């Protein structure tokens, strides 16, 4: 049986990390693509030379022509400009929208049957534009945000409670930005909801609010520390989890930026919600019950994403 083919569009820090993780997990043969000739070829060769040491069988090639992604089963898009200190994700809009137009055309021509995972920021607007530019089915184009945001939330909670990260489940809804909505009520330690843990004296509401805010600022905290770029290990691991769910038909319940067609009262937009990912792409959107405060926070997040999509249309009217 032929191996799966994974196309990584963008060979920066996330792209290289994606290639290494995909190789280690033997998800398939890997093509690193970048318009900067030499970088994908060099990274591909470097990672390939680690395969005898690490014991994985996968072909790794680098390319600067979209024809190399032909027939890919999964495309993971990181192409674009990363955040620098002082920039918001939204500051990247104009630059990265043009990149999405080129990437969308490449995928449309060479990999129209792929499951596409977008990581480029501002995430919710970029995945929406990428689906429009590529013309791929809406359930086959998703944004990586919720898995990463939930992972950050889970880590901070595990540190607060001094328990294993494996015993924490966490939910983050909404846009991938300052208005994201980490849901304490639906987050648990070994099945015990966070509000119950406050009553049990494990933490305080004030401490939990600080953790929620730190989760919202998770990307900016790393940008501020690195000073020359943005996070790449955790974003890459998060996207690989989504790709693996698709390739192995795992039916994983994963939060991601998915296309909504009426769920949560939202239409024709990509927003972070819990989904089931399997061989059909986004096979189901899970519509959880939100209380008044949660719904208001979610609606505020949706409004922020809608504003970004409107800004995209102003730049590229063809997106209407």
UniProtKB/Swiss-Prot annotation:
Reactions catalysed: (S)-malate + NAD(+) = oxaloacetate + NADH + H(+)
Record key words, sorted: NAD, Oxidoreductase, Tricarboxylic acid cycle
Binding site for NAD(+): 10-15, 34, 96, 119-121
Residue sites binding substrate per the record: 83, 89, 121, 152
Gene Ontology MF term list: L-lactate dehydrogenase activity; L-malate dehydrogenase (NAD+) activity
Enzyme type, top EC level: oxidoreductase
EC nos: 1.1.1.37
Alphabetical GO biological process terms: lactate metabolic process; tricarboxylic acid cycle
Active site location: 176
Name of one Pfam family that matches: Ldh_1_C
InterPro entries with a match to the protein in the record: L-lactate/malate_DH (IPR001557), Lactate/malate_DH_C (IPR022383), Lactate/malate_DH_N (IPR001236), Lactate_DH/Glyco_Ohase_4_C (IPR015955), Malate_DH_type3 (IPR011275), NAD(P)-bd_dom_sf (IPR036291)
Function recorded in the entry: Catalyzes the reversible oxidation of malate to oxaloacetate.
Protein family (similarity comment): Belongs to the LDH/MDH superfamily. MDH type 3 family.
Name of the protein in its database record: Malate dehydrogenase
Lineage summary: Bacteria, Pseudomonadati, Pseudomonadota, Alphaproteobacteria, Hyphomicrobiales
Gene name of the record: mdh
């Amino acid at each position: 049986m032929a191996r799966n083919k994974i196309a990584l569009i963008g060979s920066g820090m996330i792209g290289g990390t994606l290639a290494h993780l995909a190789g280690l997990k033997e998800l398939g043969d890997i093509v690193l693509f970048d318009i900067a000739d030499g970088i994908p070829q060099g990274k591909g060769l470097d990672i390939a030379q680690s395969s005898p040491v690490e014991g994985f069988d996968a072909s790794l090639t680098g390319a600067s022509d979209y024809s190399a992604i032909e027939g890919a089963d999964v495309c993971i898009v990181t192409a674009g400009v990363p955040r620098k200190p002082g920039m918001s994700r939204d500051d990247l809009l104009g630059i990265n929208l043009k990149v999405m137009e080129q990437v969308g055309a490449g995928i449309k021509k060479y990999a129209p049957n792929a499951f596409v995972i977008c990581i480029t920021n501002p995430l919710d607007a970029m995945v929406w534009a990428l689906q429009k530019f590529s013309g791929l089915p809406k359930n086959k184009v998703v944004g990586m945000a919720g898995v990463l945001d939930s992972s950050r939330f889970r880590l901070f909670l595990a540190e607060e409670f001094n328990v294993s990260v494996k015993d924490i489940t966490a939910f983050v809804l909404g846009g991938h930005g300052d208005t994201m909505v980490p849901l304490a009520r639906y987050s648990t330690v070994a099945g015990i909801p966070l509000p119950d843990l406050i009553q049990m004296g494990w933490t305080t509401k004030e401490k939990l609010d600080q953790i929620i805010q730190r989760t919202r600022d998770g990307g900016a905290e790393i940008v501020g520390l690195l000073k020359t770029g943005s996070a790449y290990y955790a974003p890459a691991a998060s996207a690989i989890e989504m790709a693996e769910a698709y390739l192995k038909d795992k039916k994983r319940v994963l939060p991601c930026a998915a296309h909504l067609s009426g769920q949560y009262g939202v239409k024709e937009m990509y927003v972070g919600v819990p989904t089931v990912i399997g061989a059909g792409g986004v096979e189901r959107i899970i519509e959880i019950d939100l209380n008044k405060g949660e719904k208001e926070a979610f609606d505020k997040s949706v409004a922020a994403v809608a504003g970004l999509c409107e800004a995209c249309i102003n730049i590229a009217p063809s997106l209407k």
